[in-house]
Amino acid sequence: TPQGHYTLAPLYDVMSAYPVLGEGPGKLSPHRARLAMAVRGKQAHWRMRDILRRHWIGLAERHGVIGMNNESAADIIDTLAVRTPTVIENIRNRLPPGFPHPVADSILQGLQRAADRLLQQH
């Protein structure tokens, strides 16, 4: 935080949730998936489906996040979302032999859907 305090990031939940999201036995409905930690803007948002671009921007602004060249939180989010396909490609190329493809696919496809959603909410 700007006051020098540490807070945990809610993003660690995302990777662990994607492999089990879905419908049917042994799966977690995407409509019910909740983060262990809320994304906090003006209010706390726990459900993954309810967290919108504006909530991330509010969180960043609340904590004084600016880019290295004074980019706004919205600009940083746009840059991250636009670069996501390249990052996914690089990750796929670096996966160790034998890494379970269903796990990688669910995480990386979920990441791309999240990036697309951020860009659509412009």
Q: Predicted regions: what is each one?
A:
Residues 1-122:
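Anionic ligand-binding catalytic core segments
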